[in-house]
A protein has these predicted regions:
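Serine/threonine-rich low-complexity intrinsically disordered regions
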Residues: 11-14, 25, 29-31, 50, ...
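Detector for Asparagine
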Residues: 5-6, 44, 88-91, 100, ...
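Catalytic core segments in nucleotide and nucleic-acid processing enzymes
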Residues: 116-119, 123-124, 129-228
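Interdomain/boundary linker segments immediately adjacent to catalytic/signaling cores
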Residues: 23-112
Length: 228
């Protein structure tokens, strides 16, 4: 039997319906954890994703969740900002201020949402971790493995501790990771940024920062650093 285009689109159509239903529940933007959880829930239901699927294909599903959340966020923007579409701005400053508020909301949401999606992967994989553990000088790494109690217990071997930061892009902010957990000399940084330059990768390596990226992005990096 030949499968028509309409049948192929059933999961995508269901995803759109689920997202519309989610958006209808809110009059304003929900917090990031609610938005991230909603995107995952919509995607997992539409495509019949199980916990076993998440544990088995975390790289692929993480990226699909990120894409799904961006689509969901756009739908929420359409609802919340629709009154502005026909508004007459009195001057350029008023217009740019409004535009900047919209863009800044997007930027501030992205990083925290990535943390929520990573946590969901760890949960599905039954990995023990703790978020936002307070370390030296009130620093707060995004994730400590196994947890803060082990980190602060100096009888617990330091080589069994892992620190992971999550940043959608690295740029200069990756340096924040270096001082976030003194007991852990080798830091890990998860990012969605592709094609980082050789110079920046060398600087990261020299600073004992190890990148963690989705598998499909590895080929965008210089071959010399793909196995680091």
């Amino acid at each position: 039997k030949l499968i028509g285009n309409n049948e192929k689109k059933i999961p995508e159509d269901k995803l759109s319906v689920l997202m519309d239903s989610f958006v209808a529940r809110f009059s304003d933007f929900p917090d990031t954890i609610t938005m991230a959880s909603g995107a995952r829930s919509c995607y997992n239901e539409a495509f019949h994703i199980s916990e076993r699927d998440i544990a088995g294909k975390p790289d692929r599903l993480l990226l699909q969740w990120v894409d799904a959340e961006y689509t969901l966020f756009q739908k929420m923007e359409e609802k919340v900002y629709s009154p502005l579409f026909h508004r007459n701005f009195s001057n350029v400053s008023e217009f740019t201020e409004t535009a900047n508020q919209i863009l800044n909301r997007r930027k501030s949401r992205a990083g925290k949402s990535l943390e929520h999606h990573l946590a969901s992967v760890f949960d599905a994989s039954h990995i023990v971790y703790e978020e936002q553990v307070i370390t030296e000088d009130n620093k707060k790494p995004d994730f400590i493995f196994p947890d803060g109690r082990c980190y602060h217990n100096f009888d617990f071997p330091a080589d069994l501790l892992i620190s992971l930061a999550a940043k959608t892009t690295c740029k200069d902010r990756w340096r924040q990771v270096i001082s976030e957990a003194d007991r852990i000399p080798e830091k890990h940084l998860f990012t969605l940024q592709q094609a980082i330059s050789k110079n920046q990768l060398k600087e990261m390596k020299d600073s004992h920062v190890h990148l963690v990226v989705p598998q499909k992005y590895i080929t965008t990096y210089p071959e010399k650093y793909r196995n680091d």
